[in-house]
Amino acid sequence: MKNKILLLSIVLLFTGSVFAQKADMSLIPYRIGDVWGYASADRSIVIKPQFEDAELFYEGLAVVKKAGKYGYINTAGKIIIPLKYAKVTHFRFGYFPDSKNTKPADGDLHDEKKVLFAGASLTVDGYEICIGAKGQRMPKCPAIPENSATDLNIPEKVVVKTNYSTIQKSDLFDKITDDYKMVPGAEQTYYIATRANNYGVINNKFEVVLPFEYSMIKKKNLGGMTYLLAEKNGMHGVFFGNGSPYISVENTKLQPVSAKNGANYFIVAKDGKTGVKDMTHKYVVESIYSDITYDQTSNGFILTGADSTKGFWFITGKTVEPKYAELTVLPGGEFIKVKTQAGKWGYINSQALDFFEE
């Protein structure tokens, strides 16, 4: 196996989100009162609630807490690694390089030994070590495969800029800043231009299709068609690429969102209320919230109530109304983790079903 590796420091073990890895969502932590167990997707209890805390399963093992100490159980609920640690991380795979097969020139490895490991410490401020799947201490920490550090593997974006300096200034405009076609392959070309510090749009016949009265105009491709995001006097709206109105310029906030399910939405705010519209102008999230943000790690929108409480709208169409003190979205969009006003955490699935009981 030929893999480049990224060396792991002990410090990185406890950052949690540095390296992406999928959890096993077939068993979900389930809380009854103050104790945690595990339930299947239909909320049937599989592992009896008995722990002070319980995390998701990774590679067949899950972190649990009892009597103030952390350890690990398997999917049958059996304690595999004793509950004796002050802090731990979930298990993941790493590699021990074979030093005989290391290229001196660039450090590439021909052969590696794949190992399952986690970070652990016997005291909160103590020395952090790596342990194996049976709880044994490793002499050193494994390396992390470079392809698991997703933020390091995003290809650089190539931005092609058009030089408009050859287009002479005229009485119609001062400068062209961008161009576009309504749809790929269309004959008509449109130009975003400025005049007297205001933005407008002209076509290739030098006809004004959007007057020069906006403080900002930007193009946005949604569903294969070009739209124009416009701002005037602090208000935001959207036009079709040909200048026809789409969403009136009367919103204090307007944010286009291309969701992971392929659908496109607009977060719109007016008169202090925020909602979400689909491409047919229908409100899929009613305009009653103080703020809404799209969560990039999932398929949904975080809702903020007037009292700063948090809720969530799943792409499935289900709404969890704002009433929680905190909210964390789990990658994949199937679950959120919420903190109640009483300070207790719990999981909710994309059908808005609670995996906890008070």
Name the predicted role of every residue range.
Residues 4-14:
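Sec-dependent N-terminal signal peptides
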Residues 16-20:
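Sec/Tat signal peptide C-region and signal peptidase I cleavage site
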Residues 21-358:
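Residue-level detector of conserved, function-critical positions
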